[in-house]
Amino acid sequence: MFDQTTNTEVHQLTVGKIETANGTIKPQLLRDAVKRAVTNFFSQLDGQEASEVYEMVLSEVEAPLLDIIMQHTRGNQTRAANMLGINRGTLRKKLKKYGMN
């Protein structure tokens, strides 16, 4: 499972605010998209039990997030870590987890 840092990051991203140079953005659209995707996932289970849904959702959000941020920063891990609000070591660990190193 993910550590507490990841839980905090996802919580801030989905229910908090994102600080930018031009102000604060509330990511309601992201929250709504995740809610629709999870609802769709459960509707397709056809009565089967799901397991490890938390891990699945986090990895499905985290992997593309890391990919896009690394593209945005042109591979600059220090900038990417700062944008994510995590330290560079944590970023490197996450990139390795998803084979993005």
Curated annotation (Swiss-Prot):
Transmembrane segments: none
Nucleotide-binding is among the record's keywords: no
Annotated keywords: Activator, DNA-binding, Transcription, Transcription regulation
Gene3D superfamilies: Homeodomain-like
DNA-binding span(s): 77-96
Gene Ontology MF terms in the entry: DNA-binding transcription factor activity; sequence-specific DNA binding
Cross-referenced InterPro entries: Fis_DNA-bd (IPR005412), Homeodomain-like_sf (IPR009057), HTH_Fis (IPR002197), Trans_regulatory_Fis (IPR050207)
Protein family: Belongs to the transcriptional regulatory Fis family.
Function according to Swiss-Prot or TrEMBL: Activates ribosomal RNA transcription. Plays a direct role in upstream activation of rRNA promoters.
Entries under PANTHER family matching the protein: DNA-BINDING PROTEIN FIS (PTHR47918:SF1)
Subunit structure: Homodimer.
NCBIfam families according to UniProt: PRK00430.1
Protein's name in the database: DNA-binding protein Fis
